[in-house]
């Protein structure tokens, strides 16, 4: 920790004393009638059909609107409020549907037999077929978002609470919209305020994350945990008694405000009624009934203990509040990000960068694309971590036995994470083209990496080839041996074993930690329940269904794991090449002057098409799609086979050949979606078909060249001219970049929606 010099303190003081500019841009509704008002070229209106494409491409590219960093940053800040408003409206709609149309209370009363339903479909021309029997006399559309399980964890027990939340969310949406307008038109922050990094870290880490987590811990302690205790007791068949009344049904539950009464709450958690005296006298053991470290899963609900979750959020909130105060803001004490960065020098032998991290602070503070790139990479990785924790440590009651919800949440968080990581590559490329000044980065680590880019990319290329040939070669070998009737020569758990010994070692290390006192800090050591059951734990059943069990790994897992590794490395190769060669390459030394996206590099330099940083993102999206498809296929089949007991444990012997994947996974498990017509899941059959069409539509844009379409349009325009019905807006074929963008968008949408229908019909169809 260091004391900042007086002039630095003064500078910070000025920023925080006068952080905003009043009335920088009066509200002008007339602009809304003029599409493309932010561009002199587009605001003139369309002459060709290219206008509509440029309108879409540049509407959110704030850099090109004004070229002013302060103005662009204000727009981003204002857009955040708009984004939050949309989220609140979306949440309000979910709450409203839950309150008015769903079977939430029916599910809450019998969560192991009743299925979650969103609404009942009106009978217009036979649509009532979609209303499946979900139990408890409710016919409607089954959902798999996990929203019911989440509401139960929050402590919501009736429709009026959901309606109150719906109204509250709409009010919050209005406040957010007002905030966006206010902070752009009436009181817009100055550029210095946005670039006051330490204050931003203080506000985000201590304020938003720390206090937010602490506030949520308060809700979990006072509402969530007591409600969970009462509901769990009902579901276990041994209801609790409050004030002499047995809480036997949902109707008997106390209202949330009643749970804040010490006299009532003391009958559930005596520690909650003991007052704050124990806190200030450091007798924190008195709170151990509602702030627990039980570990493992609640045997009634198959989910983490609500009191453990409350304890987690309390601890995390305190850590974040302390962590948010590590940085130097008003008082001259604390760490400076610039000083921390510049104190790190490159290794003189392994990574010679004489100027170390000099210039990096300014680049990260001033480049919005660089910031977004790092944030997307971190958040994407976090989303992928979440997807794995959702099944290994199920947080919400009864979610672990709702198999479609488990699979849906895994798939959702994998797609989101992967898209964010590709976005990180995209914005890193934009940052290199638009925000990177080579003169300010001589002999620092960024410059050093750019100088070493040929070695980095060629080595990564070699790794990809090695992984690809070897991992795919194992499958080719197995398919060949099976076709020749030589099972003894196959790679399998029964013949030539390729056991994932490192993964098994990681699993056993987790299990071997049980009983050690070093990690737990207690004489009796780390309890068995402190580990996820997937690490050599025990099977947990809820309502006759497997909630979680140990996940054994074998040859089939090692083989598909190396396919995952291959695809991840190729995706990274493409993205990294797009970033490192965004400004220049041997083929096109002046890429930086051509911009982030350009189709071809003009006449005279043949073979220079499709080399822009944008084109690398385009290609990476296909590899990302294939990569995540195999990941979710692996998860779906592995869980159905080895955990949920739906396919008779066929994964280990069928997943070791390509034919096995095609026959026993794709073909065998698609029977539900292909035979869904006439059933409640028939919409997934239609979605499966329609999404295939969307996917096939994309190939029209990806396989054909721009010239083909332009010639087609010209002949159609000629025919119109002959009939004197020529349009005033001249038809133009999409540019190469536009065509590729339309192609990849439909490819991803079609592919993802096809998988969506396949998964849902499979698990809903099995009941």
UniProtKB/Swiss-Prot annotation:
<feature type="binding site" description="axial binding residue">
    <location>
        <position position="692"/>
    </location>
    <ligand>
        <name>divinylchlorophyll a'</name>
    </ligand>
</feature>
<dbReference type="GO" id="GO:0016168">
    <property type="term" value="F:chlorophyll binding"/>
</dbReference>
<dbReference type="GO" id="GO:0051539">
    <property type="term" value="F:4 iron, 4 sulfur cluster binding"/>
</dbReference>
<dbReference type="GO" id="GO:0031676">
    <property type="term" value="C:plasma membrane-derived thylakoid membrane"/>
</dbReference>
<dbReference type="Pfam" id="PF00223">
    <property type="entry name" value="PsaA_PsaB"/>
</dbReference>
<keyword id="KW-0249">Electron transport</keyword>
<dbReference type="InterPro" id="IPR020586">
    <property type="entry name" value="PSI_PsaA/B_CS"/>
</dbReference>
<keyword id="KW-0004">4Fe-4S</keyword>
<feature type="binding site">
    <location>
        <position position="600"/>
    </location>
    <ligand>
        <name>[4Fe-4S] cluster</name>
    </ligand>
</feature>
<keyword id="KW-0479">Metal-binding</keyword>
<feature type="region of interest" description="Disordered">
    <location>
        <begin position="1"/>
        <end position="22"/>
    </location>
</feature>
<protein>
    <recommendedName>
        <fullName>Photosystem I P700 chlorophyll a apoprotein A1</fullName>
        <ecNumber>1.97.1.12</ecNumber>
    </recommendedName>
</protein>
<feature type="transmembrane region" description="Helical; Name=IX">
    <location>
        <begin position="616"/>
        <end position="637"/>
    </location>
</feature>
<feature type="transmembrane region" description="Helical; Name=V">
    <location>
        <begin position="368"/>
        <end position="391"/>
    </location>
</feature>
<keyword id="KW-0157">Chromophore</keyword>
<dbReference type="InterPro" id="IPR006243">
    <property type="entry name" value="PSI_PsaA"/>
</dbReference>
<feature type="transmembrane region" description="Helical; Name=I">
    <location>
        <begin position="76"/>
        <end position="99"/>
    </location>
</feature>
<feature type="transmembrane region" description="Helical; Name=VI">
    <location>
        <begin position="407"/>
        <end position="433"/>
    </location>
</feature>
<keyword id="KW-0460">Magnesium</keyword>
<dbReference type="GO" id="GO:0009522">
    <property type="term" value="C:photosystem I"/>
</dbReference>
<feature type="compositionally biased region" description="Basic and acidic residues">
    <location>
        <begin position="8"/>
        <end position="22"/>
    </location>
</feature>
<dbReference type="InterPro" id="IPR001280">
    <property type="entry name" value="PSI_PsaA/B"/>
</dbReference>
<comment type="subunit">
    <text>The PsaA/B heterodimer binds the P700 divinyl chlorophyll special pair and subsequent electron acceptors. PSI consists of a core antenna complex that captures photons, and an electron transfer chain that converts photonic excitation into a charge separation. The cyanobacterial PSI reaction center is composed of one copy each of PsaA,B,C,D,E,F,I,J,K,L,M and X, and forms trimeric complexes.</text>
</comment>
<dbReference type="GO" id="GO:0015979">
    <property type="term" value="P:photosynthesis"/>
</dbReference>
<dbReference type="GO" id="GO:0000287">
    <property type="term" value="F:magnesium ion binding"/>
</dbReference>
<dbReference type="InterPro" id="IPR036408">
    <property type="entry name" value="PSI_PsaA/B_sf"/>
</dbReference>
<comment type="similarity">
    <text>Belongs to the PsaA/PsaB family.</text>
</comment>
<keyword id="KW-1133">Transmembrane helix</keyword>
<keyword id="KW-0812">Transmembrane</keyword>
<feature type="transmembrane region" description="Helical; Name=III">
    <location>
        <begin position="201"/>
        <end position="225"/>
    </location>
</feature>
<keyword id="KW-0813">Transport</keyword>
<feature type="transmembrane region" description="Helical; Name=II">
    <location>
        <begin position="162"/>
        <end position="185"/>
    </location>
</feature>
<comment type="function">
    <text>PsaA and PsaB bind P700, the primary electron donor of photosystem I (PSI), as well as the electron acceptors A0, A1 and FX. PSI is a plastocyanin/cytochrome c6-ferredoxin oxidoreductase, converting photonic excitation into a charge separation, which transfers an electron from the donor P700 chlorophyll pair to the spectroscopically characterized acceptors A0, A1, FX, FA and FB in turn. Oxidized P700 is reduced on the lumenal side of the thylakoid membrane by plastocyanin or cytochrome c6.</text>
</comment>
<feature type="transmembrane region" description="Helical; Name=XI">
    <location>
        <begin position="741"/>
        <end position="761"/>
    </location>
</feature>
<keyword id="KW-0472">Membrane</keyword>
<feature type="binding site" description="axial binding residue">
    <location>
        <position position="700"/>
    </location>
    <ligand>
        <name>divinyl chlorophyll a</name>
    </ligand>
</feature>
<keyword id="KW-0603">Photosystem I</keyword>
<keyword id="KW-0602">Photosynthesis</keyword>
<dbReference type="GO" id="GO:0009055">
    <property type="term" value="F:electron transfer activity"/>
</dbReference>
<feature type="binding site">
    <location>
        <position position="609"/>
    </location>
    <ligand>
        <name>[4Fe-4S] cluster</name>
    </ligand>
</feature>
<keyword id="KW-0411">Iron-sulfur</keyword>
<feature type="transmembrane region" description="Helical; Name=X">
    <location>
        <begin position="681"/>
        <end position="703"/>
    </location>
</feature>
């Amino acid at each position: 920790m260091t004391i900042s010099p007086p002039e630095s303190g003064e500078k910070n003081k000025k920023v925080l004393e006068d952080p905003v500019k009043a009335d920088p841009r009066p509200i002008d509704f007339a602009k809304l009638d003029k599409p493309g008002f932010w561009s002199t070229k587009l605001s003139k209106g369309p002459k060709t059909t290219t206008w509509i494409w440029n309108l879409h491409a540049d509407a959110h590219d704030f850099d090109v609107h004004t070229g002013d960093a302060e103005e662009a940053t204000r727009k981003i800040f204002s857009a955040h409020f708009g984004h939050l408003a949309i989220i609140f409206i979306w949440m309000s709609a979910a709450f409203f549907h839950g309150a008015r149309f769903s079977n939430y209370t029916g599910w809450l009363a019998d969560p192991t037999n009743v299925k979650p339903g969103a609404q009942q479909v009106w009978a217009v021309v036979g649509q009532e077929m979609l209303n499946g029997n979900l139990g408890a006399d409710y016919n409607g559309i089954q959902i798999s978002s996990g929203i019911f399980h989440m509401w139960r964890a929050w402590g919501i027990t009736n429709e009026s609470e959901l309606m109150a939340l719906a109204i509250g969310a709409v009010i919050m949406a209005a406040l957010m919209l007002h905030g966006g307008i206010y902070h752009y038109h009436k009181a817009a922050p100055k550029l210095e305020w946005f670039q006051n990094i330490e204050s931003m870290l203080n506000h985000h880490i201590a304020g938003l994350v720390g206090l937010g987590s602490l506030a949520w811990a308060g809700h979990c302690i006072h509402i969530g945990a007591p409600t969970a205790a009462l509901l769990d007791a009902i579901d276990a068949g041994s209801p609790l008694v409050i004030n002499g009344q047995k809480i036997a049904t949902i109707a008997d539950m106390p209202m949330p405000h009643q749970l804040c009464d010490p006299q009532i709450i003391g009958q559930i958690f005596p520690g909650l009624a003991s007052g704050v005296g124990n806190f200030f006298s450091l007798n924190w053991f008195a709170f151990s009934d509602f702030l627990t470290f039980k570990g493992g899963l609640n045997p009634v609900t198959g989910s983490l203990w609500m009191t453990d979750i409350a304890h987690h959020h309390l601890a995390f909130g305190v850590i974040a509040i302390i962590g948010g105060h590590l940085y130097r803001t008003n008082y001259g004490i604390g760490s400076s990000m610039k000083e921390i960065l510049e104190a790190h020098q490159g290794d003189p032998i392994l990574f010679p960068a004489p100027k170390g991290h000099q210039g990096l602070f300014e680049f990260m503070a001033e480049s919005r694309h660089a910031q977004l790139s790092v944030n997307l990479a971190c958040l994407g990785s976090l989303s992928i971590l979440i997807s794995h924790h959702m099944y290994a440590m199920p947080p919400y009651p009864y979610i672990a036995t709702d198999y479609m919800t488990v699979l849906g949440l895994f798939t959702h968080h994998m797609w989101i994470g992967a898209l964010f990581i590709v976005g990180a590559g995209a914005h890193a490329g934009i940052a290199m083209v638009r925000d990177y000044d080579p003169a300010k980065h001589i002999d620092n680590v960024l410059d050093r990496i750019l100088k070493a880019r040929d070695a980095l990319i060629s080595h990564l290329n070699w790794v990809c080839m090695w992984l690809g040939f070897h991992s795919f070669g194992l499958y080719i070998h197995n398919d060949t041996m099976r076709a020749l009737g030589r099972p003894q020569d196959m790679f399998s758990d029964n013949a030539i074993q390729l056991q994932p010994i490192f993964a098994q070692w990681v699993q056993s290390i987790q299990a071997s930690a049980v009983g050690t006192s070093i990690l737990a800090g207690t004489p009796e050591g780390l309890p068995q329940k402190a580990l996820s059951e997937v690490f050599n734990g025990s099977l947990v059943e809820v309502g006759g269904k497997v909630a979680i069990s140990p996940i054994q790994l074998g040859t089939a897992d090692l083989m598909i794991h190396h396919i995952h590794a291959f695809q991840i490395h190729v995706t990274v190769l493409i993205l990294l090449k797009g970033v490192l060669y965004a400004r220049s390459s041997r083929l096109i030394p002046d890429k930086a002057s051509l911009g982030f996206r350009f189709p071809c590099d003009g006449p005279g330099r043949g073979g220079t098409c499709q080399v822009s940083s944008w084109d690398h993102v385009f290609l990476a999206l296909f590899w990302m799609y294939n990569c995540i498809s195999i990941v979710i296929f692996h998860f779906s089949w592995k869980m159905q086979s080895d955990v949920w007991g739906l396919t008779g444990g066929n994964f280990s012997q069928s997943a070791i050949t390509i034919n096995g994947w095609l026959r026993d996974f794709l073909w065998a498990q698609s029977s539900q979606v292909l035979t869904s017509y006439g059933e409640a899941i028939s919409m997934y059959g239609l979605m499966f078909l329609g999404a295939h069409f969307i996917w096939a539509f994309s190939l029209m844009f990806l396989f054909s060249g721009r010239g083909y379409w332009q010639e087609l349009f010209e002949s159609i325009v000629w025919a119109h001219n002959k009939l004197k019905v020529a349009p005033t807006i001249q038809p133009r074929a999409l540019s190469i970049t536009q065509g590729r963008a339309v192609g990849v968008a439909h490819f991803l949408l079609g592919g993802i929606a096809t998988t969506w229908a396949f998964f849902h019909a499979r698990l809903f169809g099995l009941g």
